[in-house]
Curated annotation (Swiss-Prot):
It comes from Oryza sativa subsp. japonica. Expressed in the adaxial face of the collar, nodes and the basal region of elongating internodes. The lineage of its organism: Eukaryota, Viridiplantae, Streptophyta, Embryophyta, Tracheophyta. Plants silencing LIC are short, have increased leaf and tiller angles, and display both reduced number of rachises and seeds. Plants over-expressing LIC show erect leaves. GO terms for cellular component: cytoplasm; nucleus. Residues 106-129, 230-248 have a biased composition (Polar residues). A zinc finger (C3H1-type) spans 2-29. One of its GO terms (biological process) is brassinosteroid mediated signaling pathway. Its main location: nucleus. This is Zinc finger CCCH domain-containing protein 46.
């Protein structure tokens, strides 16, 4: 027995480092026994062993069928008869793809038999009953998975339920609250309260449905920070007033309570002296309702004047003590500024006298380019020689 026919002990242990170049056989004892049985007679004495090893034609066909029925080990479906039985009935023809992903899925024939469901376009709502019916159908057939959203039961109509919050915004809010030190339980509880409040809004809308034909405009009530119920109505809170019209700005700008304060929408005096005949209030500028320490912005106007004959405003001549003091301060400051910019005459006279005094002195010392030791003068140079020195 040669060394090549001996089984490698290191291979049986799984630690042979020679691989295919090993002098010993890399095979299990069972494989070696099968190879010895299948090996023909090397000396050629008789053909019995060869005849036994040659399979018949029937056995070859059975083996081929078994190989075809065996599933693909790579997971790309099945082969042979299994593929035909799973797909559409009948033999597969070229250029005909009849493969169905889900056998229970409806085919085109069944879809053609079933009539399409007519989806009514909700464009009008005449009475509360029809509105409630439309809303209930929407909640039944088109209920949103994400509840924190808006809803309008009319196409191109106003939003009946406002306040859309996406899950990204909710996640960002949770992270922000986590950084601020809030516990996870409180964050989850707040999100649950938001969802319950939104579900309650849907329920209330279904119970109290009202017809609505008005177009959808962005309102201030869409934002949760504003407490006002309407964007164009009067304010119901203590915050900044929301005016119903531009004519109410003058009435709302009254500082402090007083007899001249009027309610929004009430007629007030006209800026031209006669009362307004329109039901709206007077404009802001020129109305007698603004109180800043004077009776009116433009003074008292004569009544009954037409629009074209508007006279010049007569300003009140009386001045308050505070305003007069302020004007005096301004005049004094402006005078000081002007005095600083213009040289006083006294300074100019002193400079001229100094120049005349220096004219009698010897100027040769100031005209030298280099001074010797002891010749440096202690006095200031005359003004006329400053440019020559520097």
């Amino acid at each position: 027995m040669s060394r090549r026919q001996e089984i490698c002990r290191n291979f049986q242990r799984g630690s042979c480092k020679y691989g295919a170049q090993c002098r010993y056989l890399h095979a299990s004892p069972h494989q070696q026994q099968q190879q010895q049985q299948a090996k023909p007679n090397p000396f050629g004495f008789g053909t019995g062993s060869r005849q036994q090893q040659q399979p018949s034609f029937g056995s070859q066909f059975q083996q081929q069928q078994q190989q075809q029925q065996k599933p693909n080990p790579f997971g790309f479906g099945v082969q042979g008869a299994n593929a035909q039985s799973r797909n559409a009935p009948g033999p597969a023809k070229p250029f005909q793809n009849k493969w169905v992903r889900d056998p229970s899925a409806p085919t085109k024939q069944t879809e053609a038999v079933q009539p399409p469901q007519a989806q009514a376009a909700h464009t009008s709502c005449e009475d509360p009953q029809s509105c409630r019916q439309q809303i209930s159908e929407d909640f039944k057939n088109e209920a949103p998975i994400w509840k924190l959203t808006c809803y309008a039961h009319l196409r191109n109509g106003p939003c009946n339920i406002k306040g859309d919050i996406s899950f990204e915004e909710l996640r960002a809010k949770a992270y922000e609250e986590g950084k601020q030190g809030h516990s996870l339980q409180s964050i989850v509880e707040g999100e649950r309260n938001l969802q319950n409040a939104k579900l309650m809004e849907f329920t209330n809308l279904l119970n109290s449905a009202r017809p609505s034909q008005t177009p959808s405009f962005p309102t201030m009530s869409s934002f949760p920070e504003v407490k006002n119920n309407s964007s164009f109505g009067a304010s119901q809170t203590n915050g900044p007033p929301v005016f119903s019209s531009f004519s109410q700005i003058g009435a709302a700008t009254n500082i402090g309570p007083g007899p001249g304060t009027t309610a929004p929408g009430m007629p007030a005096s006209s800026p031209f002296g006669h009362p307004s005949s329109a039901p709206l209030a007077a404009p802001t500028f020129g109305s007698s309702q603004m109180k800043f320490g004077v009776s009116s912005v433009f003074g008292n106007q004569g009544s009954g004047q037409p629009f074209g004959s508007f006279q010049a405003p007569r300003f009140p001549s009386s001045k308050s003590p505070a305003s007069s003091v302020q004007h005096r301060d301004i005049d004094r400051q402006s005078q000081e500024l002007l005095n600083g910019m213009v040289t006083p005459p006294s300074v100019m006279f002193e400079e001229s006298v100094g120049n005349n005094k220096n004219e009698n002195q010897d100027d040769s010392i100031w005209l030298k380019e280099k001074w010797a030791i002891g010749e440096i003068p202690l006095d200031e140079p005359p003004q006329r020689h400053v440019s020559h020195v520097f």
